Amino acid sequence: MLQSLARCPYPFVWQALAANPHTPPAALRELTTARDSVWNDNRLLRLLAEHPGADHAVLRAVLDAVATKLAEGERPYAAVLSLAGRLELEADELRKLGTFQGTSARLRHLLDLRLSARIR
């Protein structure tokens, strides 16, 4: 049932699925390509990055989507910082997010703080 809802055209449904801890990774993976508006897309990516059931494939897809948004000049900063807290992803992969033109000095600083806290 949750898998079929991921194909729904409504962003509030996508966000509800991404916030539901019982949503399976396959449905989460499908949500990584959902697009609506800048605000809704960035919120969805943050929710996916924070989801307790997100596996490596889901997190990798979120990472790729966030990188694309940064390259386009958008600011999915909350998703970047949420990804930085996920140990399933390599710190070097995440550190690259700070090199995009769309990142601010503050985001780079917070990203470095989160990644350095992971090492300890």
Predicted regions, residues:
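Alpha-helical scaffold segments
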Residues: M1-R120
